[in-house]
Amino acid sequence: MSGSVLIAAGGTGGHISPGVALAEVLAEKLSSFGFDAVYLHSLVRNKDNPDLLNPPCEVIWHNVPQLGGLRTIFYPLLFIYPFLKTIFLFNRLKVKAVIGMGGYSSLPSILYAILFRKQLYLCEQNCVPGKITRIFAKFSKKIAFSFPLAEGYAINGKTIGNPVRRRVVPEHLNIRQNENLHEGKKNTVNVLVLGGSQGARQLNQMILKTMENSEISSKYKFRLLTGTSLYEETKSKSLGDAEIISYANDMKPNYEWANIVVARSGAGVLAECLVFGLPMILIPYPYAADNHQKENANYIESQGAGVTIHSTSDDPTRLVQILLGWKDHSEILREMGHVSLALSNVNAAYQTVSYFFTEHN
């Protein structure tokens, strides 16, 4: 197949990061997969996204109107101009295949593939398929899933794992973080708290309240990535020796430091924690579309790699209970770490590209 392949990775970091991971593979092995070029297609607002600051290929920036309010009524009219630009541009770039990573911003690329009979492939990161996947599954040649779909969703595809960027992948795939936690070798357990790029006030406040427990503070050391908008607020309320960080472009050192991760349950964070063999305490974002974070967390918990706290408040009771239960039982963390690592797929990016372009149905 000659021509180019385009990866529509526009919306949030959960769509962008795995898309860039696929681009890394394609950029390195273009001829092996039958293409002359690879492009990323992303929203202009994502120009400062860390994953797109040093991309493995050219990024085509675009704008597409968002749904919501009165714009929903006039959406077809608002969509026409950017879509016409997409058509002319993609024809010039000789786009032969489109990989949609999900989210409304992938709509122009997907429609182009359908209308002009190009090959369409979809990646679904969550246990609950998003609207893009549900609507356009029947038009796609193949679909790659990061996790098994939740009960009630029947879409043909292959579960491979969420593609992870090379710069995040640990150099040595093992669970060294939790091998030395038994008495006499390590007195404290490192807990990494991830609120995401925009932060999560609920998680920050829950951790600060948890640290007020003397048994917790004597056994566990906390590092909070608060999100830039919540850094000052969290820092001012911190009374213990927690390490407060606004945001980290390079997550590898933080994962290597951690023994446990407390986080939301977006697919990207889950995939990264899995490749580091980290036990997880997951607090799903309750307002995520189709409650997909809840289903993601339920899957991780059902496999034994983490536990879930379903809460919309910052009440620390359940978190304190979990941490106290683990305090003198390092074997629990080691076992969860083994399960976490077993669920990971560090080669998901390559396997996804191979599934799309070399494997036969």
How does the language model describe each region?
Residues 303, 308-310, 314-331:
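C-terminal "capping" alpha-helix adjacent to the active site of nucleotide-linked donor transferases
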Residues 95-97, 256-270, 278-279:
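Acidic donor-binding loop of glycosyltransferase active sites
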Residues 5-10, 33-77, 310-312:
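Conserved nucleotide-sugar phosphate-binding/catalytic loop shared by glycosyltransferases and other
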